[in-house]
Amino acid sequence: MLRTQGLRYNYGGDGPNMAFPDLELKRGEELLLLGASGTGKTTLLHLIAGMRTPTEGTVELVGKPFSGLPVAERDLTRGQHMGIVFQTAHFVRSLTVSENLALCQSLAGQEADPHRIQALLEGLGLGHKLNARVDALSVGEQQRVSIARAVVHKPGVILADEPTSALDDQNTEVVLQLLRNQAADAGAALLIVTHDQRLKDHLTERIELSPIPTSA
């Protein structure tokens, strides 16, 4: 489903030249990418998601080249096959919760499915927030809506960027279980990128991310 090979990224100037390990993730699999600050976690996430273009190497999605696609085609492919939970939630603030989820389905080339949206929100304890404005939600509620938005179009890959870094132990377990359950329901691969060492107790498949700057 998701495969990377020989990824490197050069920030140019005095910025680091970063090399990353190869990854392969199939539907239904989970992988934890651990790394301290400065190891390039966010850079790697952006490369995988097609938000940056690698200096070298490739990203394949659903068995096809992804990283080398034109930007517009890359955006469309991402919308169809990926769901992303960002560290800070991003929504269209003028829309309701259900409208934000329907927009995600539309960007994936799907018709809005009110029944799926309602069922998904109810499963996350947010059925009563269906028509609420996202800026009226608490931080925790926004995070759950972010998870709903990441899976509403049934993507093949879910990427989560530091989903638990600001949470206490109890809420860390709650959010992690929500992610895993929703990924399983969608039949999606789950990739969590974080510095949160607590997640090692929950996910056995993991890679310690420590890319070595290269001069090449």
Spell out what each predicted region is.
Residues I158-D161:
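Catalytic Walker B motif of ABC-type/P-loop ATPase nucleotide-binding domains
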Residues G12, A102-H115, G123:
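ABC-type ATPase nucleotide-binding domains, specifically the catalytic core motifs of the NBD
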Residues R133-L137, E141:
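Conserved ABC ATPase signature
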Residues F66-G83:
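ABC ATPase NBD coupling module
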Residues A49:
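Helix-to-loop junction immediately C-terminal to a conserved catalytic motif
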Residues V152-G156:
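A short, proline-enriched helix->beta-strand linker immediately N-terminal to the Walker B motif
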Residues L95-A102:
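Short coil-to-helix segment of the ABC ATPase nucleotide-binding domain corresponding to the Q-loop/switch region
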